[in-house]
Design a protein with these regions (language model features):
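Low-complexity, Ser/Thr/Pro-rich intrinsically disordered linker/stalk segments at domain junctions
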Residues: 104, 108, 121, 134-136
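Extracellular carbohydrate recognition
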Residues: 28-31, 60-61, 124-143
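Extracellular beta-strand-rich recognition modules
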Residues: 35, 41-57, 66, 113-124, ...
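Extracellular/lumenal carbohydrate-interaction signature centered on repeated Trp-anchored short motifs
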Residues: 27, 39-47, 94-96, 109-111
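Extracellular carbohydrate recognition and processing domains
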Residues: 78-110
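Extracellular glycan-recognition surfaces and repeat-rich motifs
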Residues: 1-29, 61
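Extracellular ligand-binding interfaces
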Residues: 45-88
Length: 144
């Protein structure tokens, strides 16, 4: 978490989350960032995830990609977490030039529970295709 690299204006300053805030992402990366605390969906009939994203990654063959997972919020302290569902399994793109809004319904298995969101990123080991990465800002869950 920190300031975005130079040349990428933020939707709302001063911070965002990204793959590497100081340089291009590394080869063979496997990183994740979870929401701090839990999100209460115990009374929810439906829930929508919204966030702003800026994507600049190798999308040749979808080997470099972002993933958004929903985790059981009561099971985050151990070495193993329980996945309740995948919101998006294959976020890719190459230099869109602007922040864009991501919107998706959370899976039914998450409703009625305390949850956490996990934003994961993996990359291949091809040296000629590293890029800035995946940056996320203004995350919110709309509960209905």
């Amino acid at each position: 978490v920190g300031p975005v690299p130079p040349g990428i204006p933020l939707p709302s300053a001063p911070n965002c989350v990204g793959t590497n805030l100081a340089a291009n992402y590394g080869l063979s990366s496997n990183t994740w960032q979870r929401t701090p605390g839990t999100i209460d969906l115990t009374g929810a009939a439906a829930a929508t995830l919204l966030f702003q994203q800026w994507v600049d990654m190798d999308d040749f063959g979808n080997l470099d990609r972002g993933t958004v997972r929903v985790l059981d919020g009561s099971d985050l302290s151990g070495g193993t977490v329980t996945e309740l569902g995948v919101v998006q399994a294959n976020i890719t793109g190459f230099s869109p030039g602007a922040w864009v809004e991501f919107s998706a319904e959370l899976p039914a298995a998450a409703l009625g529970q305390m949850v956490a969101l996990e934003f994961g990123f993996v990359s291949d080991d091809f040296a000629d295709s590293d890029a800035s990465g995946w940056y996320i800002d203004d995350v919110e869950v709309l509960v209905r």
